[in-house]
UniProtKB/Swiss-Prot annotation:
HAMAP family linked to this entry: 16SrRNA_methyltr_A
General function of this protein: Specifically dimethylates two adjacent adenosines in the loop of a conserved hairpin near the 3'-end of 16S rRNA in the 30S particle. May play a critical role in biogenesis of 30S subunits.
SMART domains documented for this protein: rADc
Source species taxonomy: Archaea, Methanobacteriati, Methanobacteriota, Stenosarchaea group, Methanomicrobia
Top-level class of the enzyme under EC nomenclature: transferase
Keywords: Cytoplasm, Methyltransferase, RNA-binding, rRNA processing, S-adenosyl-L-methionine, Transferase
EC numbers: 2.1.1.-
Name the record gives this protein: Probable ribosomal RNA small subunit methyltransferase A
Family label: Belongs to the class I-like SAM-binding methyltransferase superfamily. rRNA adenine N(6)-methyltransferase family. RsmA subfamily.
Length: 256
């Protein structure tokens, strides 16, 4: 397996230190995704973390194994070779990673499903902007709704292309994410996730149109009941115009 084509390695030690110092990680189990040459790995180990690093590239795994042989031997570092979106992960508490841009979305969804205490993750700035898009605005999408339903997200700082090798064509953003209970009760998480995905897959359609298309998933009788009971303003809206409470309302009616 080779490294992701869009993987850009951090090279600025001052920025690495700044990232590693955001949280107190001494004695904590930290998951690192895409360690590359190990510059962030080293900083995490120096701060007393027990690190689990997942790397796709077998050549990089071999280099990391040589560089951190003593840390692997004493159990402070575990290396896993594979795709972080798919590979089985041992228990961890905190996530710190310079994510390859191409897996930003699937790994974020996976981490939210698994659960963690806090995550410091680096994204393409445009992706981070979409994560932070407010419900009810045009830039809002599946990513922003799911993230803001199940987590708090804060922007730490932006990074210039020169902080990486090779330099990307865009700026990057470091985000601090902490899971939380939904602001509005959700009776069935899977139904909520399915609903949000289906609504934004058909984002140019109204809620009513999409619900009727989901009769095969939920049953015509259930869909007819939900359409009958929902606020007409919600039914006539497109998904980007909805708020978190609206998604919860629709989902809970589908699961009742």
């Amino acid at each position: 397996m080779r490294a992701y084509r869009d993987q850009h390695f951090l090279t600025d030690p001052r920025i690495v230190a700044r990232i590693a110092d955001i949280l107190d990680i001494s004695g904590r189990i930290v998951l690192e995704i895409g360690p590359g040459e190990g510059i962030l790995t080293e900083a995490l180990l120096e701060r007393g973390a027990r690190v689990i690093s997942v790397e796709l590239d077998r050549t990089l795994i071999e280099r990391l194994s040589r560089r951190f042989a003593s840390e692997i031997a004493d159990g402070s570092l575990t290396l896993l070779q594979g795709d972080a979106v798919k590979v089985p992960l041992p228990p961890f508490e905190i996530v710190m990673a310079n994510l390859p841009y191409s897996i930003s979305s699937p790994i974020t969804f996976r981490l939210l499903d698994i659960g963690f205490e806090a995550a410091i993750l680096m994204y393409q700035k445009e992706f981070a902007d979409r994560m932070m898009a407010h419900p009810g605005t045009r830039d809002c999408g599946r990513l922003s709704i799911m993230l803001q339903t199940y987590a708090r997200a804060n922007r730490c700082f932006d990074l210039p292309p020169g902080a990486f090798s090779p330099p990307p064509a865009v700026r990057s953003t470091v985000m601090w994410i902490e899971p939380r209970e939904p602001l509005f009760p959700i009776h069935d998480r899977k139904i909520y996730e399915d609903l949000v995905r289906e609504l934004f897959t058909r984002r140019r359609k109204t809620v009513q149109s999409t619900l009727k298309a989901l009769a095969g998933m939920f049953g015509k009788e259930k869909i007819d009941s939900v359409v009958r009971d929902l606020n007409p303003e919600i039914l006539s809206s497109r998904p980007e115009a909805l708020y978190l409470e609206d998604f919860a309302t629709i989902s809970n009616q589908l699961s009742s």
